[in-house]
Amino acid sequence: MTVIDEIYSSSSAIPTVALNDEAKKPVLGLGVAKLSDEETESSVLAALEAGCRLIDTAASYGNEAAVGRAIAASGIPREELFVTTKLGTSRQGFHSAQESCKESLDRLGLDYLDLYLIHWPAPTLGKYVESFEGMIEARERGHVRSIGVSNFTEDLLATVIEETNEVPAVNQVELHPRLNQAELRQVHAQHDVTTQSYSPLGVGRLIEEPTVTTIAAEYGRTPAQVLVRWNLQLDNVVVSRSSKPERVAENLDVFDFTLEPEHMEAIEGLHDGTRVLHDPMTFMGT
């Protein structure tokens, strides 16, 4: 039984984990990539109504303002929420990272971010280290409480740590049964970096995988719920996305069952290194 499992067994509410800076972060949340403003607002409201308190957006998604409107409409106190957004590649740099952070706050209608991430390392641009240093400054100024990275490999993460003497709180990466990121997760554990997974369903490609559907039938759950639960039992924070409010609530309803070790291993056996989204070493982002 994992540490997170022990927490799950006591409550159906979404638990939190402590980041390396002692901030508390919900282990499951809503992502809003590629959602229109209307879809974003309805999905965020549905998630908040279902008990979700982690909302993950990005400047490049173009829907930060919609996230902010939904948060305002919900009436939920700010201190109960954990809001993440990300620095776009076009704004990388020491000063521009700080400016972009404030611009995101303005669009969200918030006074501070809970977590600010470098969205893509864009290593050929060569600005990810100074960007992270700019985010450290933004944190010092109270604009953000925790800082981290997204789509960073083991080597890129090591470079940030070595050159800034700061360990990112989070590395958010594509992670699902086809790409389980086992080696990267080991590095994260060594440095006390929280692994946050996106695309836990493999962009929908895994919900019809026979291994997953068979296990889902045994538990009386949907394949999506099984995939999210598998990811959580690896001690990852997970963000999932849907434009349908009923699916949003369904994907959050995963805290009243536990996958048995043999089922975890069967799903683990699907790993073949397939990446369904961008290669972080070559993709530049926006």
Swiss-Prot record:
Its EC number is 1.1.1.-. The keyword Cell membrane does not apply. It is an enzyme of class 1 (oxidoreductase). Gene3D superfamilies: NADP-dependent oxidoreductase domain (3.20.20.100). GO terms for molecular function: aldo-keto reductase (NADPH) activity. The active site is at Y61. Keywords: NADP, Oxidoreductase. Pfam families: Aldo_ket_red (PF00248). PROSITE patterns: ALDOKETO_REDUCTASE_2. NADPH binds at L201, V203, V239, R241, S242, R247, N251. The keyword Oxidoreductase applies. Belongs to the aldo/keto reductase family. This is Aldo-keto reductase MAP_4149.
